[in-house]
Amino acid sequence: MMLTGSEIICECLIEQGVDTVFGYPGGTILNVYDALYRYQDKINHVLTSHEQGASHAADGYARATGKVGVCMATSGPGATNLVTGIATAYIDSTPLVAITANVGVEILGRDSFQEIDITGVTMPITKHNFIVKDIKDLVPTIRKAFYIAKEGRPGPVLVDVTKNVTAEKMEFEPLQPKAIEPKTETYTVEDLDKAIEMIKESEKPFIFAGGGVISSGASQELKEFAEKIDAPVCETLMGKGAFDNTRPRYTGMLGMHGTKASNFGVSQCDLLITIGARFSDRVTGNTKTFASNAKIIHIDVDAAEINKNIQVDLGIIGDAKCILSELNNKLERQNHPQWLKQIRDLKDRYPLTYDESTLTGPYVIEQIDYLTDSNAIICTDVGQHQMWAAQYYHYRRPRQLITSGGAGTMGFGLGAAIGAKYGNPDFPVFNIAGDGCFRMNMNELATASRYNVPIIQVVINNKVLGMVRQWQTLFYGKRYSNTILDDKVDFCKVAEGLGCKAIRVSTKEEVAPAIKEALDTNGPVLIEVMIGKDDKVFPMVAPGGAISKAFDETDLKNK
């Protein structure tokens, strides 16, 4: 059939199983939006308040569903407004396709109105990017973009299409996309046999699971593996939910704000089996002392991660689901009762604690956890509230926690929550934010109200940039430079002005009724929770410090 380039873009999206697109129109992409008007029965376009919101929504949709998220923007500032969201997706390995339009090929390279070299701008933060100047290249490029976004280690791909291509016509033949086979060819039988030998020799094995377990769909295999080798399990922030957080062998998050049980346990283990994690600085602390008593096995789909941050004894490159499945089939059941008792003792001795006499962030998260039966999708922004959400909510399945881990993008959560709700309409969706993060992209409440998206935006308001202030308190002599936000902004009035219900909470007794009211509301709700400015996130590892030296408030008082 003879179609315009814009119609071909729509047909290619349908061919790839895309049902929802997030974006914002403009001059050079107007032909595509005209085509979307004719395809609106097949493609649901969500008009966000800002292109950054569109990129975060596409990211949230992808993380919540496991499918490729799609966002669109026009040339120039429209395209550059996607950059923060693309970078966020890149660092956290989210499959995303960003489609931008550029000026026509006849005026390309002449500093034309809203002309930006967006492929050059995004080259360091995409798996790959393309500029399409000839309509003959359009179909194979879009198909390739979706393949690259999903294949191996997922990530964002940008396709920039010149305006002439969106208007020209050519024949289009639909094609059924080929299933992407997991990468298995890079590891060997010898790799697996060596891993089994190391596991058999270990008396204190510890499993460290990252976001790669979730991307691979390997949670069931991880559960079987942990039971087979009789080992405790900890996770990265991105790996939350890869292993059921309510299971006895689960110890919590590892690293800077991980539990003492995880940090001390990894420091005491003799074999650390790392699956789909990249050993970021937030996890390892001082790399020279990290897991210094252990041999390390590193399973990852990306060969570039092996020995990048931590030198390992065995690197196995390939799909986590395939590798764990093969190991489970080959391994005999191991038993480590004394080691598990040692870990249980650490958990009992060092539980997560907070001041229960007053309203705090952890209390709010615990109430959300209780009232949703640990079944909600939790999105977050970045800071203290993010760590509380990671620590105090029980994630029982993959894709429950959606957060910016690697980039630490303030303003990520609200757009992500909107995208997550479109991807999983049957689950309650919360975005947990601090007052500093929320003000960055709070305009996306207008998107939620326009489409009546029933998300619950919780703003934990301490009137400061809480995490930065915590560092200033602990490491900068209490010199609070530009972290005080005690201003005249009324977030409840802002939310109401943007068409949302708003509830302010100032006492512990008001928290549960507010959450229940929000859950019963068919539409977006903001809950503003007023807490003290001196609340902190513990445990903590000092920047560059050893995870074996994790400390909490009691340790500081006893100094």
Language-model features: locations:
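Active-site diphosphate/adenylate-binding microenvironment
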Residues: S6-I9, I14, D19, G27, ...
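Active-site nucleophile and cofactor-binding loops and adjacent substrate-binding regions
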Residues: Y24-G26, H45-H56, C71-G78, K133-D134, ...
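A short acidic, glycine-rich active-site loop
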Residues: V46, E181-E185, S404-A407, G477-D486, ...
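Thiamine diphosphate
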Residues: Q114, R450-P543
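Phosphate/pyrophosphate-binding active-site segments
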Residues: K136, E197, N293-Q384, K508-A512, ...
